[in-house]
Swiss-Prot record:
Keyword flag Metal-binding: no
GO annotations of cellular component type: Las1 complex; membrane; MLL1 complex; nucleolus; nucleoplasm; nucleus
PANTHER family xrefs: RIBOSOMAL BIOGENESIS PROTEIN LAS1L
Originating species: Homo sapiens (Human)
Pfam families attached to this UniProt entry: Las1 (PF04031)
Protein name: Ribosomal biogenesis protein LAS1L
Keywords: Cytoplasm, Disease variant, Hydrolase, Intellectual disability, Isopeptide bond, Nucleus, Obesity, Phosphoprotein, rRNA processing, Ubl conjugation
């Protein structure tokens, strides 16, 4: 154990004499000694330098230094027992989990258990003291110390529900470590100087007359005395610490300066964004007409130019601070007051839930990201600033940050809605005009062609974007991944893209709508790819060109004149599609020969594409299939239900409204018949022979006599005709 005096270093052997003399009320010198509270408290670390060194080593990137810091904390734990600070213990547990995860050797299940135990202990330890005497919700206690609700929800899932995914555990670990670093470890370094001042003021109040002399004595005892080595192991350990003291102090200073610099730059970035908003809304109030204000925004004022220049400087120093400020509520994520001022009606894309038409928690799967874009007035509001900051590095970092935030957000709400919209908007805006832009939907293409958020698109690192999207899975990941594939073009083969989409859809449990091919019709009966109907729809496009001819031949054989006339009409409707396909092929060949006219030809094709009407509508095809199924079941006890049932909510083998009674699916009216009363078939009238079953039992059918040579080869019972007749008389068929 060591004696720690505020922020000063630890005392040596003679310094410990002062401790014991103060403990027993004795005085080493002739002067009156200081009380115990004036000197400090007994701690587990040797000196302030060791504490600072462990602080730096815990949060560095070197695994060896992190293990050394964990070993020092283990020593502290053995010295102090249960008196080790809770923040230190929680930090050590989380760092140890992180090291085991990075170094490998453990499976996913083991890592989830380790992360889960560390996170549960963290939440329990910070709330244990306040929940002993009064029942206070954990979320209320967490909000008091700036811990988000999703950490408490993660702890609840780890304790009471299904174990969350390993990525959620990692995300929680990284957040808690960052919270501990900012809230506890950095504050210990900031408060060291203040503790020294308080200790000196306390000494001045006790000994006013001999202030200078006592101060010199204490300084001499602290600085000149050194701990005496007791054994070789301890001396080696002290040498290692002494060598790392100077290096640790420098790293601590640089780390604290970096943290303070990030905070200052973040506050400065927020101030600049607020100034920008004030200037933009001033223009809106001046014109009091949104179209005129938008025209004025296109010509930035000198104040906006000044804000943009300063914000570029802050971005060069610390880009992360600017991104943090941009994604705060009130900036790229608007408030309801800002939307009302811009005459924008808030919609989160989940109209089904908002209108009360459905309460299924999976209704977000019905959201089509092809129609999700930032409202034009709001994007034009931020266009001057985003256009000025637009670069490959900044836009790439902004997109990756928004993708990483989506899993932690909810399904509905203004924040997830606008982060999702900005993500799609930036991807579409940075797609170069050409074959890639042709793949977007009509709404996205219109937004891309009608006005441009940026003067020119940046060459983003699309494979890295794919990794970011897959690394932060959420309900919208399959559709976002599809949009990224459209933007990157032929960066990945189509087969690889389809595999990634299927894996992502299965992982996020959103495989119902996400795997429908572009330009193809969805299955009208349950949109799952694992039914016979989906197999029929997947095979239909390949044979659609021959479908009309096959139908015509069948109808000619039947001699139906009316059906032939209807088929001729359908063939006339199909012909324009074939002509359009040939024209598109000719246009593609001309594009390869002349690349200068590529954009105009693609725009023409994008405008013509949505108006093709050659394919049969899903409603008519659905009615035709239902008619076929009803005809096949006509006369039976089963019928095709016309109700819209969500079969994905029912287990396999269960029906809507079915109870636990096994006899519920039995038919009300049915006839029974004995086995001997069933109709006699011609096969039964044929002369029977001796047959041997798979168990080696030979039986006689008809006369009941078997040859001795065949029966002698097998062992077992011989069933006689009378015994078989007795068995048949007791069986009933229904």
């Amino acid at each position: 154990m060591s004696w720690e005096s505020g922020a000063g270093p630890g005392l040596g052997s003679q310094g410990m004499d002062l401790v014991w003399s103060a403990w027993y009320g004795k005085c080493v010198k002739g002067k009156g000694s200081l009380p115990l509270s004036a000197h400090g408290i007994v701690v587990a670390w040797l000196s302030r330098a060791e504490w600072d060194q462990v602080t730096v080593y815990l949060f560095c990137d070197d695994h060896k230094l992190q293990r050394y810091a964990l070993n020092r904390i283990t020593v502290w734990r053995s010295r102090s027992g249960n008196e080790l600070p809770l923040a230190v213990a929680s930090t050590a547990d989380l760092i140890r989990c992180k090291l085991l995860d990075v170094t490998g050797g453990l499976g996913t299940d083991e890592l989830r258990l380790l992360y889960g135990m560390a996170l549960v202990r963290f939440v329990n330890l910070i709330s244990e003291r306040k929940t002993k005497f009064a029942k206070v919700p954990l979320k209320c206690l967490a909000q008091e110390v700036n811990i988000p609700d999703w950490i408490v929800d993660l702890r609840h899932e780890l304790t009471h529900k299904k174990m969350p995914h390993i990525n959620d555990c990692r995300r929680g670990c990284y957040f808690v470590l960052d919270w501990l670093q900012k809230t506890y470890w950095c504050r210990q370094l900031e408060n060291s100087l203040r503790e020294t001042w308080e200790l000196e003021e306390f000494r001045e109040g006790i000994e006013e007359e001999d202030q200078e002399e006592d101060k010199n004595i204490v300084v001499d005892d602290i600085t000149e005395q050194k701990p005496e080595p007791q054994d070789d192991g301890k001396s080696t350990e002290s040498d290692v610490k002494a060598d790392g003291d100077s290096k640790g102090s420098e790293e601590v200073d640089s780390h604290c300066k970096k943290a303070l610099s990030h905070k200052e730059l973040y506050e400065r970035a927020r101030e600049l964004l607020v100034s920008y908003e004030e200037e933009q809304f001033t223009v809106l109030e001046k014109f009091r007409y949104l179209p005129k204000a938008i025209k004025a925004w296109n010509n930035p004022s000198p104040r906006v130019e000044c804000v943009l220049a300063e914000l570029k400087g802050v971005t060069c120093e610390n880009r992360e601070a600017v991104l943090d400020a941009f994604l705060d509520d009130g900036f790229l994520v608007p408030t309801f007051e800002q939307l009302a001022a811009l005459q924008i009606e808030y919609e989160d894309g989940q109209t089904e839930v908002q209108r009360g038409e459905g309460t299924d928690p999976k209704s977000h799967k019905n959201v089509d990201l092809n129609d999700v874009l930032v409202p034009k007035p709001f994007s034009q509001f931020w266009q001057p600033l985003l256009r000025g900051l637009h670069s490959q590095n900044f836009t790439q970092a902004l997109l990756e940050r928004m993708l990483s935030e989506l899993p932690a957000l909810g399904i509905s709400g203004i924040r997830p809605t606008y982060i999702l919209r900005w993500t799609v908007e930036l991807i579409v805006a940075n797609t170069k005009t050409g074959r890639n832009a042709r793949r977007f939907s009509a709404g996205q293409w219109e937004a891309r062609r009608g006005w441009r958020l940026f003067n020119c698109s940046a060459s983003l690192d699309w494979p890295r974007m794919v990794e970011s999207c897959l690394g932060s899975p959420c309900w919208a990941s399959p559709q976002l991944l599809r949009i990224i594939f459209k933007a990157m073009g032929q960066g990945l083969p189509d087969e690889e893209q389809e595999k990634l989409l299927r894996i992502c859809s299965i992982y996020t449990q959103s495989g119902e709508n996400s795997l429908v091919q572009e330009g193809s019709e969805a299955s009208p009966i349950g949109k799952s790819p694992y039914t016979l109907d989906s197999l029929y729809w997947s095979v239909k496009p390949a044979s659609s060109s021959f479908g009309s001819e096959a139908k015509a031949q069948q109808q000619e054989e039947q001699g139906s004149v009316n059906d032939v006339k209807e088929e001729e009409k359908e063939e006339k409707e199909v012909l324009p599609d074939q002509v359009e396909e040939e024209e598109e092929n000719d246009d593609q060949e001309e594009e390869e020969e002349d690349e200068d006219d590529e954009d105009d030809e693609e725009e023409d094709r994008m405008e013509v594409g949505p108006f093709s009407t050659g394919q049969e509508s899903p409603t008519a095809e659905n009615a035709r299939l239902l008619a076929q199924k009803r005809g096949a079941l006509q006369g039976s006890a089963w019928q095709v239900s016309s109700e819209d049932v969500r079969w994905d909510t029912f287990p396999l083998g269960r029906m809507p409204g079915q109870t636990e009674d096994p006899a519920e699916l039995m038919l009300e009216n049915y006839d029974t018949m004995y086995l001997l009363d069933q109709p006699v078939l011609e096969q039964r009238l044929e002369p029977s022979t001796c047959k041997t079953d798979t168990l080696g039992l030979s039986c006689g059918v008809g006369s009941g006599n078997c040859s001795n040579s065949s029966s002698s080869n097998f062992e077992g019972l011989l069933w006689s005709q009378g015994q078989l007749h007795g068995l048949k008389t007791g069986l009933q068929l229904f």
